[in-house]
């Protein structure tokens, strides 16, 4: 069974504890959204899973096989990873950037199917009209969509996106998240996404991972996890929580009255 097991994972940066003995079991076909205040280890968790940050303790395993038992290259082949704030000033067209998702090394040769797959990814995200544009000419939001298309081509078992909608307008936020959810189910990915928009997280998450103060504060469905006491404690703002007809929570911050 394609299960990602995080067992007592601890991370620190200097004297700062980022994660303290975090344990989670993540299943395929589900979107796991990581939320929490700034500086609570959300990005660090993704980087540790990808092997960019060395853990102080604990273990990460896939299908019962520890990351320690694999070479770093083989472990990373399991992932499609889109970090936040990628700075790319490449003199390449959009279609060329996307098709790089199929390359494990620059010595590999591309097949016609790779080009077709890149075109399909752009079409699915509604940005096929950008295919021949140079990447450097695009807006920040357009670049985010292009990089998401590139990650789609990696055919991963584990998909990780760090704030993938931060530069997107409302239409493209919905388009990216809807496509991500659809592909997660169809391809049976184990998907992890860092989001700051709690209502977007509530709408698209199968499971929420709530981090704060180095600890796992909650893990479960949005309907079970997102309540006013938790959000007010973590974010230090008053909120009201309502639910739509399907039980999905909706959060509204309450403006503090002056004086």
Label for each model-derived stretch:
Residues 35-37:
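The feature captures the beta-strand-to-loop junction immediately N-terminal to the Walker
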Residues 50:
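Helix-to-loop junction immediately C-terminal to a conserved catalytic motif
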Residues 55-66, 75:
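Conserved ABC transporter NBD signature motif
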Residues 99, 112-130, 155:
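Conserved ABC ATPase "signature" region
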Residues 134-138, 142:
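Conserved ABC ATPase signature
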Residues 159-163:
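Catalytic Walker B motif of ABC-type/P-loop ATPase nucleotide-binding domains
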Residues 234-259:
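ABC ATPase nucleotide-binding domains
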